[in-house]
Amino acid sequence: QWSGRATLKNYFSVGIWSNYRPMGINDFFEPRVDGRVFKQDASYHAMTWMSTDYRKTLAFDLKGSYGRGNGQRYSYELGPRVRVNHKAVFRYKFKFDLDANEKGYVTDYHPQEDSIIFGNRNKETYTNTVGGSYVFDNKTWITLNVRHYWSKVDYDQFYNLKENGRLEQHENYSGNEDFNFNVFNVDLMYSWNFAPGSFLNVVWKNSIYESQTIENNTFNNFFENFQDTMNSNAVENSFSIKVSYYLDYKYLFKNSG
């Protein structure tokens, strides 16, 4: 594994990262059964990114990556940000991930026979995030993030996971495992730095979930999918207050002595 980054005189930053696993990996999580393993072959992953000058009113982040091992993985991100003034910043980020011909767990077909079904799948994931922050003063600020996560998975072949961790084609399994999954999140947080190293955070979170099995490979388009998500009854809300207080033991011991 290696990485590098550089920042130019105009505050334009670039970076690169790469990872290579020549021996492959033993994945003990993907089978979902204690004592079983899924052996994956050698893999590599490379990523590059760039960022323009954040001091300017308009700035951009761009990232792209490619990986090969358990299938092929393509990913890219685009994130413009607008700095209104020294108090307010707004951000948008779009991320797309494609896992092509990835092998992964599907179900325990015959759990009494320790038969574990894997599938060959294409998984597309779209994430849109809009956020912003506003600083009231040097001790208090508020942040808001709104995110829509959409993942759709299409299976075209099924396998049996053998005891040696390898896959063999399964001729009899014919279940429909194609699915569509969405999450819509709203996160609002107020922060107060009431003492050095000490914070009060008040957080409200709202989440909407939508999941469905897809028949005959008939996935909805983005707008139909988003509308189904907003009409879902699977809604969660949470409210939390967290206080973190920094204690300087040297200061306490000094005063007590």
Residue ranges and their predicted role:
Residues 1-257:
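Exposed, low-structure sequence patches enriched in small/polar residues
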